[in-house]
Amino acid sequence: MGRGPSIEARKNASDSKRGKIFTKIIRQIGVAARAGGGDPYNNPSLRVVIDKALASNMSKDVIERAIKKAIGEMEGVQYEEVRYEGYAPGGVAVIVDCLTDNRLRTVSDVRHAFSKCGGNMGAEGSVAFMFKRLGVLSYAHAIADEELITEAAIDAGAEDVMVYTQDDEIEVITTPEAFSRVKEEMAALGLMPYHAEITFRADSDIVVDGDTAIQVRKLLDILEDLDDVQDVYSNVDQVTLGKR
């Protein structure tokens, strides 16, 4: 009978995954700080990324060093934002957001991933029209009743409130511009989201199965594992990929 991975092997895998997450967040901090300054109180984009870093258990020292490097107080690599679009097998639309210090390397890695899995890269705007950019705040029913969260969200300027009874979850939808304000106003009422992000949501999902689902899942996994890739969005139905 075969033996499973050792405790040390599992720990190493966990540390490696954590390291990749930290690397990506540090790049995001740098870009946000360079674009809007190193003061999170006057830079909503930086504030969002810092919240994400703290939620991932990144230390304040690491966050502060990343900000200082970005604004020139410490030496560091400069990254730029790049977005690629394309199609996975089955006509699944994919958006890939990257932070890179070498565009040629990044586009080569992303193109190789698409080709390897039977997809293809497209021109700018080829799939983005199928998505909307939204702020999403996720709350558990346990922290407050549906009516209270809904009323607070509307008063704070949210666009919509979605209730998922089966998942015991309430989603508050905002515009990207109103995201930080809505989050902070609801937090002032004691309503803290367990997850908050600005993301792309597809207008409609595509269902895939069989070998197509396997290839789509493989492509998304490869893209997400690339060091330069920050976020991957698609319009594939996640249930068909076994990701819900």
Curated annotation (Swiss-Prot):
Any one GO MF annotation of this record: DNA binding
InterPro entries: Integrase-like_N, TACO1_YebC-like_2nd/3rd_dom, TACO1_YebC_N, Transcrip_reg_TACO1-like, Transcrip_reg_TACO1-like_dom3, YebC-like
GO cellular component, one term: cytosol
KW Cytoplasm (keyword) present: yes
SUPFAM superfamilies documented for this protein: YebC-like
GO biological process: regulation of DNA-templated transcription
Keywords linked to the UniProt accession: Cytoplasm, DNA-binding, Transcription, Transcription regulation
Compartments in which it is found: Cytoplasm
Matching NCBIfam families: PRK00110.1, PRK12378.1, YebC/PmpR family DNA-binding transcriptional regulator
Protein family membership: Belongs to the TACO1 family.
Official protein name in the record: Probable transcriptional regulatory protein Xfasm12_1059
Species annotation: Xylella fastidiosa (strain M12)
Taxonomy of the source species: Bacteria, Pseudomonadati, Pseudomonadota, Gammaproteobacteria, Lysobacterales
